């Protein structure tokens, strides 16, 4: 019995902190702790050293769990009992921290929704006319306005995502030899090409999302301007804007089809030249 006690006393005298590597002889007043199942040189550690190490691992989150880096045993960390006031404040702080992400998401969604409602109302007044648009919205059901107005930018964006020019271009390339008038409008559209170039994936374009968004939201303004320039004799604001939008989409689509066809032909007639460097002399 005395031998086992002497061995345990000797082990305690040989204690070494695995954080700072100090022993009992270096600091006899330090508080020691054995927080895990480790044996040997990693069994003991200073309370102050372990507290600093736990602070580094938790990084300000006092509820985070910390384990021993050697045996992976979780440290048993206890705190003094809180008073009722501090307990209520701590509970309120944790509840607020958990609720803030949901509140931020709700605020973001609400902001986007009311922005869409405002944009829809402005678009109605722009397309129909300021006075006529206000009269229409005043007579409409509020629930219909809250649902219908924010769908206006959504419909515009979805409509902008339809790449109808690509479908028209594929059909023209396929049936252009049967319609000779297309060759006069778009030169080279029906001519055979030496190779079929690889076309870029439209989803891989990082600018496409911003272009779709901006183009869709600006479209009512452009349709109104084009309608006033090309169809000034039409008295109805709505009809003039619709005609302006159709004309703009058709003209823009024709130019886009022509531009893509020329790019297609340019890639199809691409050649790789011989190297201009002199060949090495044979030894």
Swiss-Prot record:
It is a multi-pass membrane protein. GO terms for molecular function: ubiquitin protein ligase activity; zinc ion binding. The gene is marchf5. It is found in: Mitochondrion outer membrane; Endoplasmic reticulum membrane. PROSITE patterns: ZF_RING_CH (PS51292). Mitochondrial E3 ubiquitin-protein ligase that plays a crucial role in the control of mitochondrial morphology by acting as a positive regulator of mitochondrial fission. May play a role in the prevention of cell senescence acting as a regulator of mitochondrial quality control. SUPFAM superfamilies: RING/U-box. Zn(2+) 2 binds at residues 36, 38, 68, 71. The keyword Protease does not apply. Keywords: Endoplasmic reticulum, Membrane, Metal-binding, Mitochondrion, Mitochondrion outer membrane, Transferase, Transmembrane, Transmembrane helix, Ubl conjugation pathway, Zinc, Zinc-finger. It catalyses: S-ubiquitinyl-[E2 ubiquitin-conjugating enzyme]-L-cysteine + [acceptor protein]-L-lysine = [E2 ubiquitin-conjugating enzyme]-L-cysteine + N(6)-ubiquitinyl-[acceptor protein]-L-lysine. One of its GO terms (cellular component) is mitochondrial outer membrane. Its main location: mitochondrion. SMART domains: RINGv (SM00744). Its EC number is 2.3.2.27. This is E3 ubiquitin-protein ligase MARCHF5. The keyword Transmembrane helix applies. It comes from Xenopus laevis. A zinc finger (RING-CH-type) spans 9-78. The RING-CH-type zinc finger domain is required for E3 ligase activity. One of its GO terms (biological process) is protein autoubiquitination. Zn(2+) 1 binds at residues 17, 20, 46, 49. Pfam families: RINGv (PF12906). Pathway: Protein modification; protein ubiquitination. The chain crosses the membrane at residues 102-122, 142-162, 212-232, 241-261.
């Amino acid at each position: 019995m005395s031998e086992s006690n002497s061995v345990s006393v000797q082990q305690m005298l040989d204690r070494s902190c695995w954080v700072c590597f100090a022993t009992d002889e270096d600091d006899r007043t330090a508080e020691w702790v054995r927080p895990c199942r480790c044996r040997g040189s990693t069994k003991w550690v200073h309370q102050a050293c372990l507290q600093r190490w736990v602070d580094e691992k938790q990084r300000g989150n006092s509820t985070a769990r910390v384990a021993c880096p050697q045996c992976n045993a979780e440290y048993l960390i206890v705190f003094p009992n809180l008073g009722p006031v501090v307990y209520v404040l701590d509970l309120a702080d944790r509840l607020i921290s958990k609720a803030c992400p949901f509140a931020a998401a709700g605020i973001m969604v609400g902001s986007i929704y009311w922005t869409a409602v405002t944009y829809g109302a402005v678009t109605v007044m722009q397309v129909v006319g300021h006075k006529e648009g206000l009269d229409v919205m005043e007579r409409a059901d509020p629930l219909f306005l809250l649902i219908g107005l924010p769908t206006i930018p959504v419909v515009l964006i979805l409509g902008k995502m339809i790449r109808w020019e690509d479908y028209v271009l594929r059909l023209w390339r396929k049936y252009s030899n049967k319609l000779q008038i297309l060759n006069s409008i778009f030169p080279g559209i029906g001519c055979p090409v030496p190779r079929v170039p690889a076309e870029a994936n439209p989803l891989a374009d990082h600018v496409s999302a911003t272009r779709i968004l901006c183009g869709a939201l600006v479209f009512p303004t452009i349709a109104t301007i084009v309608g006033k320039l090309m169809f000034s004799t039409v008295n109805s604001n709505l009809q003039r804007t619709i005609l302006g939008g159709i004309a703009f989409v058709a003209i823009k689509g024709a130019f886009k089809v022509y531009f893509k066809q020329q790019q297609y032909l340019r890639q199809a007639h691409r050649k790789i030249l011989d190297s201009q460097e002199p060949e090495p002399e044979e030894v």
